[in-house]
């Protein structure tokens, strides 16, 4: 074919499209399932993206004998809630005493705090205990570690001293993504004493397991929404 000649799609000049196709996007599980119910057809599949807590339906996959163009789709992407976003932002981070106390106070409606012996603390007690932390250093040959003291195997012994009981565990309960159930996350609070002033480290316990459970819950919700149709749901992308 000569280079001066090009092929053009004449669909725009036709009274109708050559095939039905839409790219519907939403953040609502109910709207996603309602749309899927209306446009469901033979061969359609739903794929759940475990990395982004999202789902995509391809309606015009067709069959092995009669494959279609895969241009008619619906996408669902769930947003993280503000509480869950904040929770993830503190995981593995180090904070000074004021920052750690502020986190506990600011998100007190979502938090239950306890000591290492499982004794409950109020939000005010926990924040106050953190802000009053002090460090004493001494020379020692001993080596020992617990929740709130670290004795180096070298010569220095550093201990956290505080007259109040210290918070050790934080239960942070929130809805992680819009449309999912409330979930409890356990945060382990550790005091780091390597410098002149103590730092507080927060770590979410079994975070990866929580992420897997969230995806399974998401998939189960979609499967339940599609139970009246033949639409199959898979974890993966396409």
Where are these regions (language model features)?
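Intrinsic-disorder-associated interaction segments
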Residues: 3, 18-29, 77, 93-97, ...
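Surface-exposed polar/charged interaction patches
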Residues: 16, 20, 35-45, 64, ...
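Generic detector of well-ordered alpha-helical segments enriched in charged/polar residues
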Residues: 11, 30-33, 37, 58, ...
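An N-terminally focused, membrane-permeabilizing/fusogenic/translocator signature enriched
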Residues: 1-68, 229-238
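Short N-terminal edge-element motif at the start of the domain
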Residues: 84-96
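Intrinsically disordered, low-complexity segments used for protein-protein interactions
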Residues: 3, 37, 55-59, 102-109, ...
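Amphipathic, membrane-inserting segments
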Residues: 48-51, 57-84, 149-238
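Membrane-inserting effector segments that mediate pore formation, membrane fusion
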Residues: 95-149
């Amino acid at each position: 074919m000569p280079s001066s000649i090009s092929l053009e799609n004449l669909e725009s000049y036709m009274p109708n499209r050559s095939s039905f196709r839409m790219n519907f996007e939403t953040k609502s599980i109910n709207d996603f399932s309602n749309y899927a119910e209306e446009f469901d057809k033979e061969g359609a599949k739903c794929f759940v993206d475990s990395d982004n807590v999202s789902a995509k339906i391809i309606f015009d996959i067709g069959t092995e004998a009669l494959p279609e163009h895969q241009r008619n789709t619906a996408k669902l992407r769930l947003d993280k809630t503000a509480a869950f976003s904040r929770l993830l932002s503190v995981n593995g981070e180090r904070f000074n005493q004021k920052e750690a106390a502020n986190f506990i106070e600011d998100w007190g409606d979502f938090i239950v705090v306890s000591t290492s012996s499982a004794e409950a603390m109020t939000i005010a007690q926990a924040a106050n205990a953190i802000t009053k932390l002090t460090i004493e250093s001494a020379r020692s040959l001993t080596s020992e570690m617990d929740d709130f003291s670290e004795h180096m195997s070298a010569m220095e012994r550093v201990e956290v001293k505080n007259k109040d009981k210290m918070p050790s565990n934080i239960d942070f309960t929130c809805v992680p993504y819009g449309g999912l159930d409330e979930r409890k996350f356990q945060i382990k609070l550790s005091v780091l004493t390597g410098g002149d002033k103590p730092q507080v480290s927060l770590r979410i316990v079994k975070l990866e397991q929580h992420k897997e459970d969230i995806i399974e819950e998401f998939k189960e919700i979609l499967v339940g929404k599609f139970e009246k149709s033949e639409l199959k749901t898979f974890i993966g992308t396409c």
